[in-house]
Amino acid sequence: MKVEDFDFDLPEELIAQTPLLDRTSSRLMVLDKESGDIKDQHFTDIISYLNEGDALVLNDTRVLPARLHGIKDETGAHIEVLLLKQKEGNAWETLVKPAKRIRKGATITFGDGALKATCLEELEHGGRILEFSYEGIFYEVLEQLGEMPLPPYIKEQLADQDRYQTVYAKENGSAAAPTAGLHFTEDLLAKISAKGVEIIFVTLHVGLGTFRPVDVEDTANHKMHSEFYRLTEESAERINKIKVQGGKVVAVGTTSIRTLETIASRHDGKLVAESGWTEIFISPGYTFQAVDALITNFHLPKSTLIMLVSALSDRTKILAAYNHAVEQQYRFFSFGDAMFIH
């Protein structure tokens, strides 16, 4: 299929720049994936679509405050570092600006010297392997010195960094939030659980590749970025049992779908305890083996994520739903409203 086939017109003012005061006060568009019927609801109405014996699968990754501002020791030049992926030990793959100032062997100091870095290797496109030195626990140092790496389409400063974390975020490692989960509060999850819905967690660390535009004309030629995922034995067994008993598996976010479908596609539709790196690209024509329904935000035109949701329903129904969202002034992208495709 052509990437252009997934384009739609989006007025810039519909791109949500800040989160709503109350996580659950967002709107919810409900789309019947077979008929294309649309209902405009509130996010708290999601409870009425979840039944006893269903599974609600959430991604418990935690966003790192991965943007650091430091000084090049040799010259005093200001350097911005974005952590991308942990390598061996204290070495990280990073994106450095301006990259030309940091060559192999260069050193950078952050804060008052609580964190230092040495460049071990130069990569293309501004990438650098940096080895960090510090006292104490790295993630605690990062919490003190780092900033949240907000998506490029968000221009406003984030007043409360916790609003770019889900309330159940636990596993450090993401460069971006699994944004469908931002709508949930502990109270809403408790009400869902009290209805007999099983709350199950997976982990997928979201990479910055999630914001990278698709730069090919044909979707068949697109290569996905890789992201780390993990499913525990307990979670795998619980989901398998629910499927056998006829319950629905409802994924919260495209990251949860990518985790479950990566594993199910390798094991004849079964889920097993597994961790690794996935480059799964889900687009129309894909047959889902693990997931029945999806809670997700509204995605960018021509993105791999709008291709994924089109695979769960179909392209024409999704684009019709997106056009409806524009007409009804839904809020788009990371801090925007939600959609339930079932």
Swiss-Prot record:
Enzyme class per UniProt: transferase
Similarity field: Belongs to the QueA family.
SUPFAM superfamilies documented for this protein: QueA-like (SSF111337)
Recorded GO MF terms: S-adenosylmethionine:tRNA ribosyltransferase-isomerase activity
UniProt pathway: tRNA modification; tRNA-queuosine biosynthesis
Biological process annotations from GO: queuosine biosynthetic process; tRNA wobble guanine modification
Subcellular location: Cytoplasm
Superkingdom to which the source organism belongs: Bacteria
Protein species of origin: Listeria monocytogenes serotype 4a (strain HCC23)
E.C. no: 2.4.99.17
Substrates-to-products reaction catalysed: 7-aminomethyl-7-carbaguanosine(34) in tRNA + S-adenosyl-L-methionine = epoxyqueuosine(34) in tRNA + adenine + L-methionine + 2 H(+)
Record-given protein name: S-adenosylmethionine:tRNA ribosyltransferase-isomerase
Gene it is expressed from: queA
A Pfam family this chain is assigned to: Queuosine_synth
Keywords tagged on the record: Cytoplasm, Queuosine biosynthesis, S-adenosyl-L-methionine, Transferase
Record's function text: Transfers and isomerizes the ribose moiety from AdoMet to the 7-aminomethyl group of 7-deazaguanine (preQ1-tRNA) to give epoxyqueuosine (oQ-tRNA).
Phylogenetic lineage: Bacteria, Bacillati, Bacillota, Bacilli, Bacillales
